[in-house]
Amino acid sequence: MDRVRTVRKAVIPVAGNGTRFLPATKAVPKEMLTIVDRPVVQYAVDEARQAGIEHIVFVTSRNKQVIEDHFDDAPELISSLSRSGKSAQISELEAMLPAAGSVSFTRQQAPLGLGHAVWCARDLIGDEPFALLLPDMVSFGARGCVAGLMDLYHEVGGNVVGVEQCAPEEASKYGIVGKGETVRHGFSVTEMVEKPAAGKAPSNYYLNGRYILQPEIFSILAHQTRGAGNEIQLTDGMLTLSQSQSFHAHPYEGRTFDCGSKQGFIEANVAFALARADIGDIVFESVRDMVLSHESRIRAA
């Protein structure tokens, strides 16, 4: 294997409308909805930074200015917190502030699909491999999924995707990969199928919204015809790229919550709250009481 090029940059698409969360997302971007006390998009940024990413490219759209503000300095707020003696909160805000020049924003002017959103980052990524994190998919575990992708990428190079296992009967809901030869940090991908027909999935490993892709994907996406939903689909582009470059998959050892769905969003809030040292115990007691009360009502019905 040739020496792999360092992955320094990550793309985070944040241009979606969040219609599944209306009316909450009428004025607030879905990426700014909170899991406990930080917005969904912050989890993706933290995961990327923990994996060694140096520069993050947000692909945004109109009415998303609040995302830029979130990752900017807030001197008035810091001054107010300082006068109140809230040094712990100041430290937390300063820790999440990106270094100057390490965050860029570009626009996706029309909602033409994930593949098109990725293509919109081409000039800011340049001729480099890059990570791609879908912020709706929130990693929960001892380490983020991208860190594991980095391990696999340094082992095999090429293109790398994050996967998890679903129940076989649910494979038709996801993008599924076929499992090939096993390597230390994952396995080779033999095929990729978007939402296969029932009983036709090559495995039960589904794509969990984390990728490391080579820059050749941009030229493919530039000329790709529209696919499902009349949109430019990333999976279609990856299928074309797989004809000339290798793909490997890293099975994530944690769990990914789909926070683009109401169920996944609620589950993520409960999971992250339970894991918190400051509120975990009391949340556990509250959730347990609610579950027991709910079960009692069901039995009494």
Curated annotation (Swiss-Prot):
Using the UniProt record, name the top-level EC class of this enzyme in a single word: transferase
Q: What is its EC number?
A: 2.7.7.9
Per UniProt, which keywords does this protein have? Exopolysaccharide synthesis, Nucleotidyltransferase, Plasmid, Transferase
Q: Which GO terms describe its molecular function?
A: UTP:glucose-1-phosphate uridylyltransferase activity
* GO annotation terms (biological process): polysaccharide biosynthetic process; UDP-alpha-D-glucose metabolic process
Please indicate which superkingdom the organism of origin belongs to. Bacteria
Which Pfam families does the protein's record reference?
Answer: NTP_transferase
> What reaction gets catalysed by this protein?
alpha-D-glucose 1-phosphate + UTP + H(+) = UDP-alpha-D-glucose + diphosphate
Q: In which pathway does it act?
A: Carbohydrate metabolism; nucleotide-sugar metabolism
Similarity comment: Belongs to the UDPGP type 2 family.
The molecule here is called UTP--glucose-1-phosphate uridylyltransferase
Q: Which organism does this sequence originate in?
A: Rhizobium meliloti (strain 1021)
